[in-house]
A protein has these predicted regions:
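C-terminal interaction surface of TIR/SEFIR-family domains
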Residues: 26-29, 84-150
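A short helix->loop->beta-strand "cap" motif at the edges of active sites that frequently abuts
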Residues: 69-75
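Class I S-adenosyl-L-methionine
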Residues: 80-82
Length: 150
């Protein structure tokens, strides 16, 4: 979306680092190993979380392996929120935002192990998050929930 139109946008698609797989590929012998290889070569996980996010086997595996095995920080993008302020109530994440975590129980239950940065679907906020060294594996900050203050 933004990466193609803005070459300065700090996003590297880890899916492009391994060769493609076909829809009919076997989960255990092809898909799961490729997903894990991508995660081992990643500096963080970018999770787009909304009311329509599916708790699929691939998403569960990516979150579980990425957080619980690799310790990757997570940048959570909420497409249903369009400003930093819209995520917050009284300086903290709103309950409807936190309720979205229930869409992915493995994320909800594991996210306290790594730094997680919560941002709205706003280009500048996402750019700041992707450039923030506290949310990169080699330089990550302490495990906690983070968001940009308004």
């Amino acid at each position: 979306m933004w990466k193609g139109a803005d070459t300065s946008f700090p996003f590297a698609d880890s899916h492009a680092t391994t060769y493609s797989v076909r829809d009919g590929s076997d989960w255990e012998t092809t898909l799961k190993p490729r997903l894990r290889e991508r995660l081992r070569n990643s500096k963080n996980i970018v999770l787009v979380l909304s009311s329509t996010t599916a708790n699929s086997r691939a998403v569960r595996e990516e979150i579980d392996y990425g957080i619980n095995d690799q310790g990757l920080p997570v940048i959570v993008i909420y497409p249903e929120y369009d400003s930093k302020e819209s995520l917050l109530a009284n300086g903290s994440l709103k309950q409807p935002v936190k309720s979205l975590w229930d869409r992915l129980p493995i994320f909800r239950d594991s996210m306290s192990k790594v730094p997680t940065l919560h941002v709205p679907m706003v280009k500048v906020a996402i750019r700041d998050a992707l450039s923030n060294t506290g949310f990169m594996i080699a330089t990550k900050c302490n495990p906690d929930y983070y968001w940009y203050k308004t």
